[in-house]
Amino acid sequence: MRIALGIEYDGAKYCGWQRQVDVDSVQERLEKALSHIANKPIAVFCAGRTDTGVHGTGQVVHFDVDVDRQMVAWTIGVNAHLPRDISVRWATQVSDDFHARFSATARRYRYIIYNSALRPAIFGVGVSHYHGHLDEKKMHEAAQYLVGEHDFTSVRASQCQSRSPWRAMKHVNVSRQGDFVIIDIKANAFVHHMVRNIAGSLIRVGRGQETPEWMKWVLEQKDRRVAGETAKAAGLYLVAVDYPEEFGLPSSPLGPIFLPD
């Protein structure tokens, strides 16, 4: 039997999603909790491997299990064995041809900037703080040059192992809600550090250091050195993963919880 789960986590204290030797990861914590419920080792496969310090409200995983458990065991039961910064949001049985990574048609991220002269205390690890005023309208204008199919070499990390830098960008929207500037970005897939490098570049536009048209020029150069610096991990959330309707996965609020959808 194959089970899919929706996972939410605060990535601040973890080395990232992927299990690694001698360091704490979200995957390892989740697999331990699932194994406790199944009473046997469980391995999970995820939609996207987030980096150190990156959060998730819409991560999707799947695993195979041959024990009979009520579905509530994979939500409330698993949550009882997870730390407070990781939670299962939903669970459902899926067909054997479902794969959390390879069945996905798009991923959606939100990068959240707390744009205030004073640093936050409550949301210190859940947002990226920038003290100078940001013009979110110019950031949004610049972001529209990213929509469509492009070679994203200019916002690709040097250590990226993807075979191709080409990606299909569905949307990039920049908006403001009070002191929060939100970059909402969706693509079929992402190269390494793509969202954070885009965020760093858009911040340069928002600060008035570059014009919106500069973003188009950055893409055309196909050179990581011309784009903005990599924005901090703290503000980045994997908020949703799209799948074909045939799999019947539940939907849930994008989050994070302090932002309306």
Swiss-Prot record:
Top-level enzyme category: isomerase
GO terms for MF: RNA binding; tRNA pseudouridine(38-40) synthase activity
Tagged with keyword Isomerase: yes
Any one biological process term the GO annotation gives: tRNA pseudouridine synthesis
Keywords attached to this entry: Isomerase, tRNA processing
Catalytic residue positions: D51 (nucleophile)
Cysteines joined through disulfide linkages: none
Catalytic activity: uridine(38/39/40) in tRNA = pseudouridine(38/39/40) in tRNA
UniProt keyword Transcription present: no
Ranges that cross the membrane: none
A Pfam family it matches: PseudoU_synth_1
InterPro entries: PsdUridine_synth_cat_dom_sf (IPR020103), PsdUridine_synth_TruA (IPR001406), PsdUridine_synth_TruA_a/b_dom (IPR020097), PsdUridine_synth_TruA_C (IPR020095), TruA/RsuA/RluB/E/F_N (IPR020094)
EC number in record: 5.4.99.12
Residue numbers binding substrate: Y109
Record's function text: Formation of pseudouridine at positions 38, 39 and 40 in the anticodon stem and loop of transfer RNAs.
PANTHER family: PSEUDOURIDYLATE SYNTHASE (PTHR11142), TRNA PSEUDOURIDINE SYNTHASE-LIKE 1 (PTHR11142:SF0)
Subunit-structure text: Homodimer.
Protein family per UniProt: Belongs to the tRNA pseudouridine synthase TruA family.
Listed name of the protein: tRNA pseudouridine synthase A
Encoding gene, per UniProt annotation: truA
